[in-house]
């Protein structure tokens, strides 16, 4: 079971912390819905959305709030950020409250949460408009 993340045809989606445990079916579904390949964290142009694969071990290398700020740096107004975390009880699981706190620190709003695959849950975030 893979759900739509809300990305549409022609959108460019940037991916952070993709690894061997990332859900390939979900990644392929995003590419199919946009008609574009996912771009990596080195991509330097404007993007329409971002996917952050986040596990408890990742917190040892980087702060999630800092990573979310990095993800916003290329994000077009109205763009979505999805933070994907292992479901509770899975290796690398992260409390949803940790993601919500990091989002708040980064100036983002949590809009929804969903099961996005057999092993992953997603928290959808939106940025404040740059025009405010």
Which role does the model predict for each range below?
Residues 1-132:
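S-adenosyl-L-methionine-dependent methyltransferase catalytic core, i.e., the SAM/SAH-binding region
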């Amino acid at each position: 079971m893979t759900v739509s993340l809300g990305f549409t045809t022609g959108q460019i989606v940037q991916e952070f912390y993709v690894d061997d445990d990332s859900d390939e079916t979900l990644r392929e579904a995003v590419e199919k819905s946009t008609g574009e390949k996912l771009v990596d964290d080195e991509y330097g142009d404007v993007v329409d959305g971002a996917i952050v694969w986040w596990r408890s071990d990742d917190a040892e290398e980087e702060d999630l709030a800092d990573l979310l700020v990095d993800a916003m740096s290329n994000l077009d107004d109205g763009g979505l950020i999805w933070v994907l975390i292992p479901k509770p009880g899975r290796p690398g699981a992260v409390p949803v409250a940790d993601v919500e706190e990091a989002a708040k620190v980064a100036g983002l709003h949590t809009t929804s949460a969903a099961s996005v695959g057999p092993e992953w849950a997603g928290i959808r975030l939106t940025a404040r408009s740059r025009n405010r």
